Amino acid sequence: MTFLDTGILVGALLEKHPEHAPCLEALEESEGAFTDAHALAETFATLTGFYKVPAAAAAELTLGLKASLAVEALPLADYETSIGEAQRRGVMGGGIYDSLHASFARRKGARRIVTRNPSHFAHAAPDLEILTP
């Protein structure tokens, strides 16, 4: 199973993205591709904020991802696990969000995380294979 990080989702959705082709391939070809609902919120935020995609189009694109990969909401237990792991591994600031993704990926049995930001997972997921497209 393969967890897809927000950067992969954004890159796959935007044809003008410089890494669109490899991100789209990761979305379409990854074995057992899945993500968490928090990554959908991050995707919407990135599309509307950084890329200035109109909200209606960003919502349609983001929610359309459900047709291409499994998406699951995060329970409180994942947040508790992530905060504890972040503290033990020295993860600080916004790194908690990558810790949250990593905790979820582990719980779901992922063997790998595909991301455009491998350094973000250096402390959060040293036990998982981290791939870039």
Where are these regions (language model features)?
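Short loop/helix-cap segments at secondary-structure boundaries that form the rim of catalytic
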Residues: 119-127
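Anionic, Ser/Thr-rich low-complexity intrinsically disordered regions
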Residues: 71, 124, 131-132
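Residues that scaffold the ATP/ADP-binding catalytic core of kinase and kinase-like folds
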Residues: 11-13, 46, 124
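Histidine- and aromatic-rich ligand-binding microenvironments
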Residues: 5, 35-36, 94-95, 117, ...
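Active-site neighborhoods of divalent-metal-dependent phosphate/nucleic-acid chemistry enzymes
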Residues: 70-116
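Short, well-structured N-terminal submotif of metal-dependent ribonuclease cores
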Residues: 1-35, 50-60
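Glycine/small-residue-rich phosphate/adenosyl-binding loop
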Residues: 40, 52-66, 70
